[in-house]
Amino acid sequence: MLVHTIAEVREKIREWKKAGLTVGLVPTMGALHNGHLSLIKKAVEKCDKTVVSVFVNPIQFCPGEDLDKYPRTLDADKELCENAGVDIVFAPSPKEMYGEGHIMSNDFLTYVIPPFFYVNKLCGKSRVGHFDGVCTVVNKLFNIVQPDFAFFGEKDRQQLIILKKMVKDLNIPVQIIPCTIVREESGLALSSRNKYLSEEDKVNALALSKILFNIKACYDKGITDVKALTETAYSFLNEAHALEYLEFRDADDLEEKQVADGNTIVFIALKIGNVRLIDNIALGNI
């Protein structure tokens, strides 16, 4: 069932809640791939009813980013969702989500602003305001759908940590379910932005996973010094790569690590041409 308005979603949610059914939410920006489908599968298995939102959220894009070019494939997304057992595909317009405010100026919108300590690093360092937009839209989706469970991929691990913090601090009655990164056989993490990559770019993009897997292998052999682990990365980089960051952070609060341990996440971001890609790996069983 494809719906475009908040009122339609709320009507169905009222019916489901009255019947005592559990509701799962999978927030997406569309251009669905097997990574999204793994989240959807978990939601359908765990919940009585599943809602997938398809919304390219304008307020989480920074100036000069790919808002206008971001792939929009609603018909294909709807078919994938229906085949996966999704009950509602919620595909609102920006006006439906934000009224006239977003057209006039972001100064007219009420935002959910996550703690600066969580957003002034990694992706938030170069994408100023990005996580304000993410937290605002996810909070709105939680208010609209009122899910019991919400499913997010671990590929956007910083986002996942920030959203968990938001849910805890604002006492939002939803349980966030983290979902494992889905990779191509080559090791490349699935992403909607992979559609921008040429075949040559895809080969160069393998540097992300190769660096992370190599760091994990070195850690498993007993190397814990972050500087030493970082130095192992450079042999995988060439002139096609513009490394934005390679950082070791705590899995709970994103504090920077000097010595790696089982609660460490290794984060990487790099550009290949104009395409920015991110990935991460946990060094322990988290």
Where are these regions (language model features)?
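Short, basic/aromatic-enriched C-terminal tail that caps enzymatic domains
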Residues: E255-K257, I265-I286
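Nucleotidyltransferase catalytic core that binds NTPs
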Residues: M1-A240, R249, D253, N274, ...
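Structural motif
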Residues: K49, N263-I265
